[in-house]
Amino acid sequence: RRICRCRIGRCLGLEVYFGVCFLHGRLARRCCR
């Protein structure tokens, strides 16, 4: 589990797996790698 802090993908406090940002189990947008 890695917390991603990105403003480009609106990913704040989300769970990131393999560089992919997930929101409540759903695929949001690619954030940090």
Swiss-Prot record:
Disulfide bonds join 4-32, 6-21, 11-31. Keywords: Antibiotic, Antimicrobial, Defensin, Disulfide bond, Fungicide, Secreted. GO terms for biological process: defense response to bacterium; defense response to fungus; killing of cells of another organism. InterPro entries: Alpha-defensin_C. GO terms for cellular component: extracellular region. It is found in: Secreted. The keyword Transmembrane helix does not apply. Belongs to the alpha-defensin family. Has antibacterial activity against the Gram-negative bacterium E.coli and the Gram-positive bacteria L.monocytogenes and S.aureus. Has antifungal activity against C.albicans. This is Defensin-1. It comes from Papio hamadryas (Hamadryas baboon).
